[in-house]
Structures are given as C-alpha cells and as structure tokens.
Amino acid sequence: MLNSFKLSLQYILPKLWLTRLAGWGASKRAGWLTKLVIDLFVKYYKVDMKEAQKPDTASYRTFNEFFVRPLRDEVRPIDTDPNVLVMPADGVISQLGKIEEDKILQAKGHNYSLEALLAGNYLMADLFRNGTFVTTYLSPRDYHRVHMPCNGILREMIYVPGDLFSVNHLTAQNVPNLFARNERVICLFDTEFGPMAQILVGATIVGSIETVWAGTITPPREGIIKRWTWPAGENDGSVALLKGQEMGRFKLGSTVINLFAPGKVNLVEQLESLSVTKICQPLAVSTETFVTPDAEPAPLPAEEIEAEHDASPLVDDKKDQV
C-alpha cells in the first residue's frame, strides 16, 4: 500500500516545479543558513569532506557550489593502462551487461528500449545493438562530476526533454521505460574502442545538467529536442577529451548510462549490480589486446560501501536477490 502511494506521487506531484524550486534554492547565497544546510547534509549522508579540495563547509557560498565540489587530485588515481576503460562517476551500479538487440535491462524482469533511450535515433541505436551497457546511479552523498572512461572525440550531443521521475528501486520496477522517459543529455564520442555514448539522465530536483564544452544544457526546459554536432579528429572546432577528464556534472544528481559497441570491451568481472563505483577505477578492458590487463577496482573499506548503499535508493534490489 505504501509503495503504491509513493508511486502515485511520482505521477501526481508537480515534479518540474519541485525541480525548479530546488534549483533556485540551491543557487542562493544564504550565509549561515547555507552552511547549516550543508552541515546537516554532510552528517546525514556521511559525505567524506576529506576528499574535497575545500573540506571546510563554510567555504561554499551556495549549496550548488558544495554539491559540485571538486576533489583533490590524489584521491582518485587513474588507471593508466591504455587498454582499460575507467568508471565515469562515483556511485552504485544499477544494472550492467549486454544490450539484447533493442533491449536494455532497467531492473530485474524489466527492460527498456535502446532506440527510445536515444530519442528514436535508429542510426545511433544501430551502433550499440548487442553491445554493452553500464548504468551508474549517483546518490546524494556522491561526487557529482562525470568523467571520461577513455580518450574520446565528441561527435554529437542531443538534449531530450522528458519527465523527471525519481530514480530508485520502486520507479525502476514500476515505471516503464524510465530512463527513456526522463530528461537526458546524450553525448556520442569516437574512441579507440569504437563509438561510445555517455548519457546524463535527469530526475526530480536535478536542477541542471552541464557539460564542459557547452556549459549548462538544461535549464531552460523548452520542451524540444536539440541536437549539436562536431567535426571528427583534429579538424577545427573538434572537441577532444582525455581519459579521466571531467566531461559534465549534475547540480543535484541522478544517473549516467554508458553504451559501448558490440565486441569492443569486456566489463571487469568483479562488477555487478550494486557494486560501488569510484571514478578512474577499472570499468572495462579492450577485447583487442593480446594480454588481458589485470584490471580490478581497488577494494573499498566496508564502511564506505555501507555508507554508499545507505544513501542509495537502489539497495532494495537486494530483496530480489535473496
């Protein structure tokens, strides 16, 4: 009964207005009140401020400044093996695995459409049919900048307007095509591992989605699909990003979906649903290397995994695995 009520609220509540209100409040300078809110947030979600370049919460003028806080360089060492792709975000893996023709796993027993995720772009979808996907959820406690899994040349970006459903266990199980319905920014790259899509998905109270090459993509929310393209290679106007480099960010966060072409990468064996991710740790390895790299994410302290799972609404998935 309670879950039915919560699900009904997802359809009834004015999610756009709640999101605008959250974005407005998070951008305001409120002095001691801003610090109080940040301190309460840090305590409730067990945010590790020792990792931040500015660990003192008084140094943030707005909640948004705190939310997109940069980390100290040394806390996320990058795996430098050229055959290894790295994790794009701190968070928890929601689902991962093979794309079955047009089907991507959303939750246990529930799929959604690859082509719908890509805004009906069947040519782009053809690049990834029977490929590999990884869906990473960023909880409120996480670092909310998104990084490149490998070197890439930006070729296309599509802004897709949509709903702003919350992303959690309940909605994943009950909202059909959740990620193909929510607002999102699709970024397509040429890489040495074939085409790669990195998709930043919005949700309720995600105030904005930004990229390093174009700034704020949303808001404004104009209700129309927008598309940009860039030249290949070293042509004038091309955008090249390096492995581990920041490519975007959420102001209040949500989900990152990565799509890889078929036969190009193998996901690291240790990864599974609910694995905790840290940027620049191994995510996948090339299928074209003669010697498979010894790629394995560094072990995390038990208290870090527990804190991440406590902050993630995806942990209810454990009930399905008993």
Curated annotation (Swiss-Prot):
Enzyme class name: lyase
Subunit details: Heterodimer of a large membrane-associated beta subunit and a small pyruvoyl-containing alpha subunit.
Annotated function: Catalyzes the formation of phosphatidylethanolamine (PtdEtn) from phosphatidylserine (PtdSer).
Cofactor(s) listed: pyruvate
GO cellular component: plasma membrane
Marked site: Cleavage (non-hydrolytic): G253, S254
GO MF assignments: phosphatidylserine decarboxylase activity
Membrane topology: Peripheral membrane protein
Ranges for region Disordered: 294-322
Encoding gene, per UniProt annotation: psd
GO BP terms, alphabetized: phosphatidylethanolamine biosynthetic process
EC number annotated for this UniProt entry: 4.1.1.65
Compartments where found: Cell membrane
Catalytic activity: a 1,2-diacyl-sn-glycero-3-phospho-L-serine + H(+) = a 1,2-diacyl-sn-glycero-3-phosphoethanolamine + CO2
Keyword Glycosyltransferase: no
Cofactor note: Binds 1 pyruvoyl group covalently per subunit.
Name recorded for this polypeptide: Phosphatidylserine decarboxylase proenzyme
